[in-house]
Amino acid sequence: MTHLFEGVGVALTTPFTNNKVNIEALKTHVNFLLENNAQAIIVNGTTAESPTLTTDEKERILKTVIDLVDKRVPVIAGTGTNDTEKSIQASIQAKALGADAIMLITPYYNKTNQRGLVKHFEAIADAVKLPVVLYNVPSRTNMTIEPETVEILSQHPYIVALKDATNDFEYLEEVKKRIDTNSFALYSGNDDNVVEYYQRGGQGVISVIANVIPKEFQALYDAQQSGLDIQDQFKPIGTLLSALSVDINPIPIKALTSYLGFGNYELRLPLVSLEDTDTKVLRETYDTFKAGENE
C-alpha cells in the first residue's frame, strides 16, 4: 500500500482582506504551492485559524482548493472537533466536496481517556469511510494519543497516518515499534525536527514553513531519500524557522504569506499580528534566505 503522500504537505493559511476570506488570494497561494512541488495540501487546520472560520467559510475554502488542485495532490480537510457527532458531519461534508482525506485532532477541553479516543476516531472513520490522519498535538490539547492507542487505531482500514506534533523522538520510536510503516505513515508536525524525523524513518511533514518555501522544504526530503546528509542543507532553513518562532503559529507565517502577496497581514481575534519591528526582522530574514539561494 502506498502512503497518502511522502514529503511535504502544506498546512495552508487562510488569507483575509478586511476580515473576509480572500478567495483570489487563496487561489494564488495554492497555485504557488502546486508550482513549487508541494505533495499535499491540508485545509482548515490549526494554521488556517479554523476555530475562527464559519462552517460556510470552511466549505467554500475547501471546495475552492479541491477544484483548483484537481487531483494533482491529495487535499486533506481538517474536520476534527471535540464533539464526535459534529466531527462526523463535518467529515461527511468534506467527503461530499471531494476531499481525499480528513485530519482529526484529539478532543480538547472535554478531553477523554485512551479508550474514548479509540471510540471517537473509529466512529468517525466508520461513518465517513475516507482516509484518516490522526493529529497528535499535546501542546495545544493537553492530551496525547499513546503509542498503544496508535497501534490499535492503525489496524482500522481507513486510519492511515499520524501527524506527530509531540517533538518527542522516544514517542516516535515507541509508535514505530507498534505499526506497519508500509501502510501507516508518520508525518512530523514540527518543521524544526524534520532532519532527525526523516532519519528515523518518518514519511514526511505537515508543514507551516512550506507555505512560503515549499520547493526548498521538499528538496530537503528528496535529498534525504537519496541518501544524502541534509544537515548543511537544513541550516539556512533552520535560521528562518528560528525567526518564525518569535510568536505562536500562525501569527508569524502570515507575516510572510502576506509579504508574498497572499492576502493582507490579517488574523482573526484572538490572534493578533506581530509588532512592526518583529515583522520587519522576519521579512528581512526571509529575504536573506532567498538571496542565499541565488548565490
Swiss-Prot record:
Swiss-Prot/TrEMBL GO biological process terms: diaminopimelate biosynthetic process; lysine biosynthetic process via diaminopimelate
Regulation: Is not feedback inhibited by lysine.
Catalytic reaction(s) noted: L-aspartate 4-semialdehyde + pyruvate = (2S,4S)-4-hydroxy-2,3,4,5-tetrahydrodipicolinate + H2O + H(+)
Record's GO cellular component terms: cytosol
Pfam families: DHDPS
MF terms in GO: 4-hydroxy-tetrahydrodipicolinate synthase activity
NCBIfam families (UniProt xref): dapA (TIGR00674)
Functional note: Catalyzes the condensation of (S)-aspartate-beta-semialdehyde [(S)-ASA] and pyruvate to 4-hydroxy-tetrahydrodipicolinate (HTPA).
Subunit structure: Homodimer.
Protein name: 4-hydroxy-tetrahydrodipicolinate synthase
